[in-house]
Amino acid sequence: MEENGVIQETGGAVLTDLQYAPFVMYLQSAPFVSTACMTRVNGPPQPSSRNLESRYLNQDSYESRVEIELRDSGFYHISQIGKLILHNALINALIERWRPETHTFHLPHGECTITLEDVAMIFGLPIDGMPVSGFTDSSTNGLENEFMTQFGIAPTGADHKGSGVKFTWLRTLKRRMQLDTALGRQMYIKIYLLLLFGTNLFCDKSRMTIHWKFLPLLRNFSDIRGFSWGSACLAHLYRALCQASRYDCKEVDGPLALLCIWAWERLPFLAPMRSYPSFPLACSWMFWRSQFHRYQKWTISHIMRLLDDIHADGFVWNPYSPAHIENIVVPNDILSIDSCGV
């Protein structure tokens, strides 16, 4: 909250008091549209005419024989997340509140956003380390050379679309990997991670391919856990939300599971019932659909009205405090992250 003009940060979430009137705010830039920015002179704002398509691909499974290598890569926690069912109306309603200028959701009592703490707790990803960056080569020659260097085989013309390698080819390659050597298990993990990137962390609107630009970062297996994959995941979500805020956008991509579960943890009046306490916290929401049938029928306009009428205490500042997750054992590698704030 903001007191005397000073923005306070609590529990990793940022909220600023904007002194809202009975309306939320007016949109200042023409390329963006948000029904949350409409006035409430004679009642609640009109529901949005947009209904962005959002699809979530469940991540691939892995062989138990590669668990040691998976832990060494830093992706073991997120690999435990099973099938997730997201809520399209919730995603759409949140996008209507997103402002690209500040990378925050604008609510009647201020602004809030998704933080690195949320990424660490919801996905169990490392948020410290080297930046996930590099040269983006979209050439076919570069793709073939990198795959030949790391796997001794490269996708043919039918196995990739431009710079995107098809999931079907990667899954076939993963099944054919020999796991009786350390090198074979490491190559298996690299393929598994490419699929994880394409289905969850860095997915695009194709839902069929993953850009091979991530592969050079996996070249040295011992360096993989040294990257701040959680930071890259969060940046990708910010970018996806900014693109979805445009008036001409018809579909939203990115790590939407992070968005949904962040809302369920921080805005409990928008959440179904948690299945069972587990880490990473995304695992706690895997079976909500079988327990809360009425929640499935919530519409965009209904959720927008709930957000419009939120009270000042409707946002949970410390959802990861011992009082909130007392039955969940947080692994030491997550607790030791300085910037996590748990």
Task: Show where each model-derived region lies.
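Structural stabilizers in ordered domains
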Residues: 1-342
